[in-house]
Amino acid sequence: MLSERHELNKIALLELKKDVEETREFSSYFSKMADLLLYVNEIYDTKERTLEQLKQWNRIWYEEISQEQYAHSFGNPEFCTEKFGKEYGQIFAFLYAEMRSGFIYAIEGRLFDLVINNELFLEISNLFLSGEEHPQKIKHIVFDHMRDYSEDVFEYRIREQLDPELDFATKIVMESDLSDPDILYQYGEYISENEIDTLKFLNKLPQEEITAMAKTYVDGFHEGFIINNIDMSPKRSVNIRYTIGFEPVVREAVRLFSEIGLAPIIYRSGVSVLTRGLHKIGYISSSPNPQYEYDHRYDQAIFFDNRFMKHKLECYHNAYEHYKDEAYVFAGPACMETFGEIAFLPENKEENLKLSKKQQELSVEFQMKASEIMNQYIKPEQRSFTIISYPIPEIGDNFEEIFKEVVKVNTLDKDKYRQIQQHLIDALNQAVEVHIKGKGKNKTDLYVAMHEMDDPSKETNFENCLADVNIPVGEVFTSPKLTGTNGVLHVGEVYLNDLKFIDLEITFKDGMISEYTCKNFKTEEENKAFIKENLLYNRDTLPMGEFAIGTNTTAYVMAKTYDILYQLPILIVEKMGPHFAVGDTCYSHCEETEVRNPDGKEIVAKYNECSKEGEYFQCHTDITIPYEELDSICAITLGGDEILLIKDGKFVLSGTETLNEPLTEIG
């Protein structure tokens, strides 16, 4: 049946090409789109594929949304609107982006997804061929299509995330000749020099270094279960997330995970409007054009309403119920992130689809309820994770040197940091609040309230964080008490979720965000909207979910030496100064799980006033103040005594002074 629909679609597309002039002023669009879909159908039909052919397809496919060609691409809402008017222009840009998912379906051999994609386009094109087109009619068609196929789409997506039997990418990793960089074109993702050069570089490293990198990563994941007293014996699978080009490390990680009884689940980040999120989750590659992706962040605005949200949640629940056995044995994600991309400063376009206020509220509600569904089947207290990060060649000419330095940072002596960080914790446990103050142009002036402890001889507010789930080593952190947490957090420049924020300033009142601004755009309205969309995720406020002090001065020296401070991921940057997370605490949904520090004390600061009432936000974004922008951090006791921890960016608390030794290298 599917194959018949596929053949009929190809015939209909050829007919559309013949009759395209009947779509009148829209003929250029429909002609281009028909060519695009005929191209992916031809790729699907080509069963014997050489690497050279895959390479050629890849370059042709991604070329037309490249930065060089995007100005005149139908994927550009600005261009489409200029050519066809706002109502049709936005719809056409949306449809173009949705049809581009067809390349992945063709490469993977996913005929069902390819067929329904074709049918959506053909149904819309028929409106124009018959002269019955109207923006509202098109939106109805899109809504009905998304609703009708949500069950199938979400069932497959959840299966992708839980079933090792879906092994498209696993086979590429485990069976390909990794000495040939062209094997990367098998994925169907955009392949740039970053991916090619990363693989070439890793192929030059001795096998023992590759094994050591994989072991650091796998051991971190395994230790997460041990440290948090989670029984790993029922677990049978792990999700490996990475950037294409790291296959030698991933292959070794698969082998090491198998030794502890875990099979790999490797899936790509979502490619359709139903499966894409604001963040890419899965295996990824460099973006052919970050502005294109930014322009299409809220494409769901064209059909997302309360009816659809409820239906989507029902489909989500049904999919998890179908794969509940696979969910039960899922151990969690092991994430290998990358950094070093050229900074992306997005352009705000009036023509982009945007969520209405009502849709924003529904989106927040969906994220909350979808998270609750997932947590029913993959219980937070029964899973773990790990996350590690490496540079990519785009970071500059010193890539190989920086890579080796990052490997060193990722494998620093945990025992040394355990002892030093304990001195910080002992001082912080005496505090009722901690005062953090910036210097120079940094306007930070914050008082963070601490939870009361019943028995300080057996309890602690701060976790001694070593290199297990969160690599590299180097922080102590707590869940602040919201009441009494007040002041301003300011950073001159910071990268959060691949976006650059300039002069980010957030005011907290009783632990909740009360005001915010930045200087990314000309108008205050644009700046506030940028923060609300990309930091608050369309909420009106978020709590301060974490306060931490990073101790990894070695990483800081590396950043300064190679001038990459503002290219490093938050995973490393958070270890290089005090940081504050907005959103949930680090113990979200796991507050009742007993966690102890190496000294045996139980960590008791796990709830805050929001989570105590069952209120969660499904986000956690860390914001760090670099040492150089820091005047002081001071623990203030109940009696008003001040215990100085850091002064002028240097550690001054007794027992922590050795952390300053790396800083002498940069003066």
Report the location of each language-model feature:
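Long, well-ordered mid-to-C-terminal structural blocks that present hydrophobic/aromatic surfaces
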Residues: S479-N538
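Extended hydrophobic packing segments that form well-structured cores
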Residues: D599-G667
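Dual-mode signal for accessory low-complexity, basic/Gly-rich regions
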Residues: E515-Y587, E591
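Active-site bordering "gate/hinge" segments
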Residues: M1-T483, K647, F651-G667
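Active-site lining segments that contact anionic ligands and/or coordinate catalytic metals
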Residues: G484-N486, F501-D503, D510-I513, L542-E546, ...
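Generic beta-strand/beta-sheet core signal
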Residues: R241, I388, K437-K439, H451, ...
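Short solvent-exposed loop/turn micro-motifs enriched in small/polar/acidic residues
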Residues: N429, N497-K500, D540, V573
